């Protein structure tokens, strides 16, 4: 329906573009309310890979700024072993291009597909970034995000945390 009625470029000033902009703004506002984000905090991308690339690049640029300022930064980029393959690929790519010199480390999961919190407790103090899924799109396993957050808080980790929440949205 949207492509029939609102096919215009939402960045243009003509009538079809203005209709597309209104539709896009309405969807963005509904998404913002659904996830509890502030105004101007929802970005639409073309898909999972672009969203992951954007989040990883943003976080690793911030890590590099911390390094340049002489701040203590963890040496690990931790990602759930069942993450979308774009996650470790993006981490490796931007780590190399930005020259952050960090080590990638897969966080194992247990027999039910849940992140091994015992391993995360050991690694969290060394983390510069942690990447996890809220819900696995292949197995349906739901991550215990509150427990992961508790590990991060107890470890006093300043690591950036990216959560792929697409599969959990609205549940």
Task: List PLM regions with ranges.
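Pyridoxal 5′-phosphate
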Residues: 1-171
């Amino acid at each position: 329906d949207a492509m029939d009625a609102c096919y215009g470029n939402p960045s243009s000033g003509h009538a079809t573009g203005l209709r597309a902009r209104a539709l896009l703004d309405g969807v963005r506002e509904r998404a913002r309310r659904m996830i509890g984000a502030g105004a101007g905090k929802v970005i639409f991308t073309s898909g999972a890979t672009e969203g992951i690339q954007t989040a990883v690049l943003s976080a690793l640029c911030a890590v590099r700024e911390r390094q340049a300022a002489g701040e203590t930064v963890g040496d690990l980029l931790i990602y759930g072993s069942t993450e979308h393959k774009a996650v470790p690929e993006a981490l490796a790519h931007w780590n190399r291009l930005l020259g952050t010199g960090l080590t990638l480390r897969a966080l194992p999961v247990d027999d039910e597909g849940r992140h091994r919190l015992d391993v995360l407790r050991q690694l969290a103090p060394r983390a510069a970034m942690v990447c996890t899924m809220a819900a696995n799109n292949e197995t349906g396993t739901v991550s215990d995000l509150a427990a992961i957050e508790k590990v991060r808080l107890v470890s006093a980790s300043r690591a950036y945390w990216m959560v792929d929440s697409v599969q959990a949205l609205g549940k």
